[in-house]
């Protein structure tokens, strides 16, 4: 049975699926750990690789660990997260390939974010778990690599292949915070280099 409450809930859910586009200047003013080339990141910041630490071969189980990690990191950062997402540069062939493998909900999120807003740059504020889960799935499935910038507890993480995500920190205390969070979700930060 359909009622007004469901209609309202659907409307609220829909609105929360739109990322907020920000300018490159806004991004630069808010984000401390940023660089154009990943090699610069490795040279300038303490870093490590976020990887699965369990013994389960199921991709879905592994992906769930990353989704849980990123959602808890979002909470830890009080919803203060920026991502880069090059959605306006997607060619039709690439978009079709991505849409083929997404479930309906993720397809709608992607299409809505391509069509329903003015895009100021490649940077977007992300402040809810549905969107964080969506971005995580794009990364883990190697469909679209997004960099995720956490602001409250500064850390930057690059989307990457083979469920191995480079993480960058300014200071060992941030490394320990995220390392503890990773362990909680059957992940680990490996290959740590301190600067």
Positions of predicted regions on the chain:
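Structured alpha/beta or helical-core interaction and ligand-binding surfaces enriched in interleaved
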Residues: 1-164, 169-195
């Amino acid at each position: 049975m359909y009622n007004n409450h469901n209609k309202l809930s659907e409307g609220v859910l829909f609105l929360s699926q739109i990322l907020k586009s920000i300018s490159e200047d806004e991004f630069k003013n808010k984000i401390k750990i940023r660089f154009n080339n990943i090699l610069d990141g490795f040279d300038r910041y303490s870093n490590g690789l976020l990887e699965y630490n369990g013994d389960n071969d199921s991709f879905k189980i592994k992906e769930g660990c990353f989704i849980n990690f990123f959602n808890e990191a979002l909470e830890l950062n009080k919803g203060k997260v920026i991502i880069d997402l090059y959605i306006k540069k997607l060619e039709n062939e690439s978009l079709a390939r991505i849409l083929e493998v997404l479930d309906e909900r993720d397809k709608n999120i992607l299409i809505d974010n391509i069509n329903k807003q003015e895009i100021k740059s490649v940077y977007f504020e992300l402040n809810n778990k549905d969107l964080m889960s969506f971005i995580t799935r794009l990364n883990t499935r190697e469909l679209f690599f997004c960099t995720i910038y956490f602001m409250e507890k500064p850390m930057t993480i690059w989307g990457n292949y083979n469920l191995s995500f480079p993480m960058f920190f300014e200071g060992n205390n941030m490394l320990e915070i995220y390392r503890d969070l990773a362990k909680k979700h059957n992940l680990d930060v490996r290959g740590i280099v301190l600067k």
